[in-house]
Amino acid sequence: MALRTLASKNALSFALGGAARPSAASARGVTTVALPDLSYDFGALEPVISGEIMRLHHQKHHATYVVNYNKALEQLDAVVVKGDASAVVQLQGAIKFNGGGHFNHSIFWENLKPISEGGEPPHGKLGWAIDEDFGSFEALVKRMNAEGAALQGSGWVWLALDKEPKKLSVETTANQDPLVTKGASLVPLLGIDVWEHAYYLQYKNVRPDYLNNIWKVMNWKYAGEVYENVLA
């Protein structure tokens, strides 16, 4: 039982930094996750992000990460019961990739708001921190756009809060690596998906256009709340 508990906790912590959202537990005690509902319609972000992209992104891509992550957790539980250490190690990649995909996208949906509501620059404590750490809001946007455009292959660009020095930073992660893989003290405030599935149907191969436009639907209220809660 100790081996099972330790392996499960290590896998979840490694993949998600403790941020998994449980939905249901199996008879063996495996905690799974569920696809989160969106607080807006698929077409609410148009013309910045098309309804077709949002539907495919949420219903197909994110849903697949959820299915595969839950499957990997169930497999992990089974091999831990058997005491198969090599199988536990082999499952870490699937847990990290699919768990990271679920965690990253769950943040991404919260970071977005309908075109009629989003895009206002952050105010309050987060706005002040951005001015202090980057010089201005415009400088932050320029930095994140540059980092996102330069990221080779697929991945994410993040506005992160480092809890230890209480400073903001811009970070990138490859593939579906969650931000916690860059440092245990980093908290994601805002993430932009730069996988092609997030923009290709609309923007083709011009990733910079997608990055320039997505700021029009950013939910800075959410990012500000996370920032203040972490520092409270």
From Swiss-Prot:
Gene Ontology CC terms, in alphabetical order: mitochondrial matrix; mitochondrion
GO molecular function, one term: superoxide dismutase activity
UniProt entry keywords in alphabetical sequence: Manganese, Metal-binding, Mitochondrion, Oxidoreductase, Transit peptide
InterPro entries in UniProt: Fe/Mn_Superoxide_Dismutase, Mn/Fe_SOD, Mn/Fe_SOD_BS, Mn/Fe_SOD_C, Mn/Fe_SOD_N, Mn/Fe_SOD_N_sf, SOD_C_sf
Transit peptide endpoints, chain numbering: 1-29
Cofactor info, note text: Binds 1 Mn(2+) ion per subunit.
Residues binding Mn(2+), per UniProt: 57, 105, 193, 197
Pfam families the UniProt entry points to: Sod_Fe_C, Sod_Fe_N
Co-factor(s): Mn(2+)
Superkingdom of this protein's organism: Eukaryota
EC number(s) reported in the record: 1.15.1.1
Top EC group: oxidoreductase
Gene3D superfamilies: Fe,Mn superoxide dismutase (SOD) domain (1.10.287.990), Iron/manganese superoxide dismutase, C-terminal domain (3.55.40.20)
UniProt catalytic activity: 2 superoxide + 2 H(+) = H2O2 + O2
GO biological process, one term: response to osmotic stress
Reported function: Destroys superoxide anion radicals which are normally produced within the cells and which are toxic to biological systems.
Subunit structure: Homotetramer.
Protein name, UniProt field: Superoxide dismutase [Mn] 3.2, mitochondrial
Organism of this sequence: Zea mays (Maize)
